């Protein structure tokens, strides 16, 4: 009986202690959950990169749990018996469940919070964008109806076209007036009379008109003197009519055919030139292009031309004699040296 009572008392004590340890454990888990919630709130209130901070939370949670476990183990190993060590093993089995539950809860909460934050940020982004747009200058309104700038450009283009047309008309009128003035000047005698006629008619005399009248008067004068008029395709202000008439005369003289009776005195002298040798005379006439070989007498030639012919014959004879002497001394007498001593003396004597 005594033994049974003793065992019953011990069993009751053990149950009481187990209940107290369970209560202590439940209080510890509640405190941990509460501390984790506070930490989550503090961490969620901070701005920044959420993913990086979640990783830090997980690592910090693991560390805190391990620290709390080590403290509890030390405390219990010092103060409790082996029976309590059994309860420790039970706690070890139960703790991962509670930890996983608490973690899952916290994760779920953190995910929901992060989603709500992301939604808030997404909602806030267009607002910020709208603020930046309001700060920038407003875009120009869409084109509706007429644009003032385009109308002004079109009006300017029309004015330019009108001005061009007016200028072309004025140029045509001035060209026609100049042609009329030139025709009047060619028909009339002098420039003064034409200018006076223009003044009388009421037309305004410009420097260009006066210049055209002067040129027309010069053309009329050249036509009267030479009989050659300046063609219409030449600019009368750029061509001198007198010089043009002289050039035309030269062209006619150059390209017209030669007449048989027209022979100059120099041509007759060259034809009757005599070198003293018949073969040389024939060669010379061929070179000069003299076709006929008529030997004219002294009666047909003038006294002056006869004298010139005689002088030419003497000159050619002397040249032949000198050539023969030089040839004989340079080519045949090479034994006398280089030809600068005795041969040169012989040349001096000659």
Swiss-Prot record:
PANTHER family with a match to the protein in the record: ARGININE_SERINE-RICH COILED-COIL PROTEIN 2
Annotated region described as Disordered, given as residue ranges: 1-146, 328-350
Pfam name, any one: SMAP
Top-level taxon of origin: Eukaryota
Keyword entries, A-Z: Coiled coil
Biased composition (Basic residues): 10-24, 52-132
Ranges annotated as biased composition (Basic and acidic residues): 25-51
Coiled-coil regions listed: 146-187
InterPro entries listed in its UniProt record: SMAP_dom
Similarity field: Belongs to the RSRC2 family.
Name by which UniProt lists this protein: Arginine/serine-rich coiled-coil protein 2
Lineage: Eukaryota, Metazoa, Chordata, Craniata, Vertebrata
């Amino acid at each position: 009986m005594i033994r049974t009572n003793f065992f019953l008392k011990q069993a009751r004590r053990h149950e009481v202690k187990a209940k107290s340890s369970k209560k202590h454990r439940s209080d510890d888990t509640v405190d941990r959950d509460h501390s984790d919630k506070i930490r989550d709130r503090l961490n969620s209130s901070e701005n920044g990169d959420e993913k990086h901070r979640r990783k830090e939370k997980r690592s910090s949670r693991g560390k805190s749990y391990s620290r709390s476990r080590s403290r509890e183990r030390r405390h219990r190993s010092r103060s409790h018996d082996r029976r309590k060590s059994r309860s420790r093993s039970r706690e070890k089995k139960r703790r991962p469940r509670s930890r996983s539950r608490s973690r899952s809860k916290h994760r779920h909460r953190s995910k929901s919070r992060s989603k709500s934050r992301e939604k808030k940020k997404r909602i806030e982004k267009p607002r910020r964008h709208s603020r930046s747009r309001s700060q920038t200058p407003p875009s120009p309104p869409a084109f509706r109806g007429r644009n003032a700038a385009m109308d002004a450009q079109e009006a300017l283009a029309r004015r330019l076209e009108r001005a061009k047309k007016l200028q072309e008309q004025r140029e045509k009128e001035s060209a026609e007036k100049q042609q009329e003035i030139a025709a009047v000047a060619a028909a009339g005698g002098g420039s003064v009379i034409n200018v006076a006629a223009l003044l009388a008619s009421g037309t305004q005399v410009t420097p260009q008109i006066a210049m055209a009248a002067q040129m027309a008067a010069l053309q009329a004068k050249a036509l009267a003197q030479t009989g050659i008029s300046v063609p219409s395709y030449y600019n009368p202000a750029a061509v001198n009519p007198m010089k043009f008439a002289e050039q035309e005369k030269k062209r006619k003289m150059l390209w017209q055919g030669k007449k048989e009776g027209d022979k100059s005195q120099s041509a007759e002298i060259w034809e009757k030139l005599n070198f003293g040798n018949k073969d040389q005379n024939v060669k010379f006439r061929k070179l000069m292009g003299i076709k006929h070989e008529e030997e004219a007498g002294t009666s047909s030639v003038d006294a002056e031309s006869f004298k010139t012919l005689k002088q030419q014959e003497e000159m050619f004879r002397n040249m032949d004699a000198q050539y023969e002497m030089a040839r004989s001394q340079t080519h045949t007498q090479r034994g006398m040296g280089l030809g600068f001593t005795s041969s040169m003396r012989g040349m001096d004597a000659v």
